[in-house]
Regions:
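Short amphipathic alpha-helical interaction segments
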Residues: 84-99
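Short, locally clustered residues in the helix-turn-helix/winged-helix DNA-binding domain
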Residues: 61-69
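Short, cationic-aromatic polyanion-contact patches
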Residues: 108-131
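Short alpha-helical segments that sit at the start of domains
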Residues: 32-62
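Amphipathic alpha-helical dimerization/coiled-coil segments
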Residues: 127-163
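Short acidic, hydrophobic short linear motifs in intrinsically disordered regions
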Residues: 70-82
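A short, conserved structural fragment
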Residues: 98-108
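C-terminal regulatory/oligomerization modules of transcriptional regulators
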Residues: 1-19, 148-163
């Protein structure tokens, strides 16, 4: 009976920790998607506004950044498949970002054209990630995540000990 009570108490505590974690994570995600980060530079603010204006634009820019981080340009066709969008939509995003100087493209025919993020897009994303890291640090999510892991270990140990 005591074993069942201990296990139940551990499960309840774990559920409360998970709920608190979920609430804090949700607050961070809402803050990010609401564009709550204050950006001083106009060029960076324009990148932020563009990337937050639609999920496809955000993903387009993230794929450009990843291509640059990996030093592996991404093709038009790869992006079309990844984003699952029409030629018109992709061509429009590509042109808008190229005209704004946020991507560097090759001059090949459209299907084989490749892109990488520009230095400003990379700098903007790096600044954004510094903001996200600080938000996570301030939220205490890491501590909550570790507490959940420890709770799982206690539950597993309690189950094992009382078999």
């Amino acid at each position: 009976m005591k074993h069942e009570t201990n296990i139940e108490a551990l499960h309840q505590a774990k559920k409360r920790l998970e709920l608190e974690y979920n609430k804090k994570q949700l607050a961070i995600e809402i803050s990010i998607t609401a564009g709550s980060r204050v950006v001083e530079e106009l060029w960076e603010r324009k990148i932020m506004q563009y990337s937050l204006s639609s999920s496809n634009r955000r993903k387009f820019m993230m794929y450009a950044v990843r291509a640059s981080y990996d030093n592996e340009p991404i093709t038009y066709n790869q992006l079309k498949k990844l984003l699952n969008i029409s030629d018109i939509a992709l061509t429009t995003m590509w042109r808008e970002c190229s005209d704004a100087g946020w991507i560097v493209t090759t001059k090949a025919k459209r299907a084989n054209q490749t892109l990488l993020a520009s230095d400003n897009l990379l700098k903007s994303y790096n600044n954004y990630m510094a903001h996200v890291r600080q938000a996570y640090k301030n939220s205490g999510l890491r501590t909550l995540a570790q507490a959940i892991v420890e709770m799982e270990h206690l539950i597993a140990h309690e189950d094992y000990e009382n078999r």
